[in-house]
Curated annotation (Swiss-Prot):
L-tryptophan binds at D134. GO terms for biological process: tryptophanyl-tRNA aminoacylation. ATP binds at Q10, A11, T12, G18, N19, G146, E147, D148, I186, K195, M196, S197, K198, S199. This is Tryptophan--tRNA ligase. GO terms for molecular function: ATP binding; tryptophan-tRNA ligase activity. InterPro entries: aa-tRNA-synth_Ic (IPR002305), Rossmann-like_a/b/a_fold (IPR014729), Trp-tRNA-ligase (IPR002306), Trp-tRNA-ligase_bac-type (IPR024109), Trp-tRNA_synthetase (IPR050203). Keywords: Aminoacyl-tRNA synthetase, ATP-binding, Cytoplasm, Ligase, Nucleotide-binding, Protein biosynthesis. It comes from Rickettsia felis (strain ATCC VR-1525 / URRWXCal2) (Rickettsia azadi). A motif ('KMSKS' region) lies at residues 195-199. It catalyses: tRNA(Trp) + L-tryptophan + ATP = L-tryptophyl-tRNA(Trp) + AMP + diphosphate + H(+). Belongs to the class-I aminoacyl-tRNA synthetase family. One of its GO terms (cellular component) is cytoplasm. It is an enzyme of class 6 (ligase). Pfam families: tRNA-synt_1b.
Length: 330
């Protein structure tokens, strides 16, 4: 029996190279080996201020990227979180057993809420509980995530343990966390100490998957390096050039040693020019397919509804099992 994999991307903004290398490319490989559920986290998206039209476009855009990158809806279950109401239902049940102190320790809330946490919405504070519900509802064996989500996954495991101990029965599966080594954390092109992000105010901090070839060349040409004139890898002292090398090796699948040797006497100009071409070679087919899919909204909606229908079968079983243990009438 195949193990179950669950993961998703928040439906806000445009997906970028970091999303592709850190998540989606790995999912495409996993779909042949596992029973996969990949969702669009649109309920998570409204924990921050977002216009209705922007949310709608983001949902369709993320789905189009999933498909353009190679996820096959005949092999995996792809759905929007909001279309499976059981996610919110299980999240409430989990909220009722999750200690407040656990949530207060979550570092991402502090980062996203900023200096005035009193004005942040409750949804942002309890975001990790909904994330736990997203995972536990499908009894996922494996959850591939980035390093920045590791704390939330540990909370998910703790919440599953609370439920199982409370009812003295293994109702919820405690998932394993999968964090890949290379490509899992691509950094900003403007600051090698910050993760590449959709929310960064500077568009030149990231390579969006729908960027055209000229824009990719411009962004890589202007990507921050340092005062040294040679290519070398050291994340501590040279974070920006090390980030560009991580992108290069992730897309070319060449070793760091080989890449560095190739540019030993050529400086940054040639390295950046070649890196831009490697990015274009990898992303252009995805971009072309993405644009084609975005012109067929009817097909995209069909995929979402089909996936949600399939996901709800598994989700409703888990929710009913948990509700029964609480004492609700099923």
């Amino acid at each position: 029996m195949k193990k179950t994999v669950l993961s998703g991307v928040q439906a806000t903004g445009s997906l970028h190279l970091g999303n592709y290398l850190g998540s989606i490319r790995n999912w495409v490989k996993m779909q042949e080996e596992y029973n996969c559920f990949f969702f669009l986290a649109d309920l998570h998206a409204i924990t921050v201020d977002i216009k209705p039209s922007e949310l709608n476009n983001s949902i369709m855009g993320v789905l189009a990227v999933y498909l353009a990158a190679g996820l096959n809806p005949d092999k995996v279950t792809i759905f929007a979180q909001s279309m499976v109401k059981e996610h919110a239902e299980l999240a409430w049940l989990l909220n009722c057993v999750t200690p407040l102190g656990w949530l207060k320790r979550m570092t991402q809330f502090k980062d996203k809420a900023g200096s005035d946490q009193e004005k942040a919405c409750l949804g942002l504070f309890s975001y990790p509980v909904l994330m736990a519900a997203d995972i536990l509802i499908y009894k996922a064996d494996i959850v591939p995530v980035g390093e920045d989500q590791k704390q939330h996954l540990e909370l998910t495991r703790d919440i599953a343990g609370v439920i199982n101990r409370r009812f003295d029965k293994e109702i919820l599966k405690v998932p394993e966390v999968l964090i890949s080594e290379t490509g899992t954390r691509i950094m900003s092109l403007r600051d090698g100490l910050k993760k590449m992000s959709k929310s960064d105010i500077s568009d030149f901090s990231r390579i969006n998957l729908k960027d055209d070839n000229d824009l990719i060349h411009q962004k890589i040409k202007k990507a921050k390096t340092d005062h040294l004139s040679f290519v070398s890898y050291d994340k501590e002292t040279r974070p920006e050039i090390s980030n560009l090398l991580d992108i290069y090796r992730s897309l070319s699948e060449e070793s760091l040693e080989k890449i560095i040797n190739n540019y030993q006497n050529q400086g940054f100009s040639k390295f950046k020019e070649d890196l831009a071409e490697i990015i274009i070679t990898n992303l252009q087919p995805i971009r072309d397919k993405y644009l084609e899919l975005m012109n067929d909204k009817e097909y995209l909606l069909k995929i979402l509804h089909k996936g949600a229908e399939k996901a709800r079968i598994r989700a409703s079983e888990t929710v009913n099992e948990v509700k029964e243990q609480f004492g609700f009438v099923i």
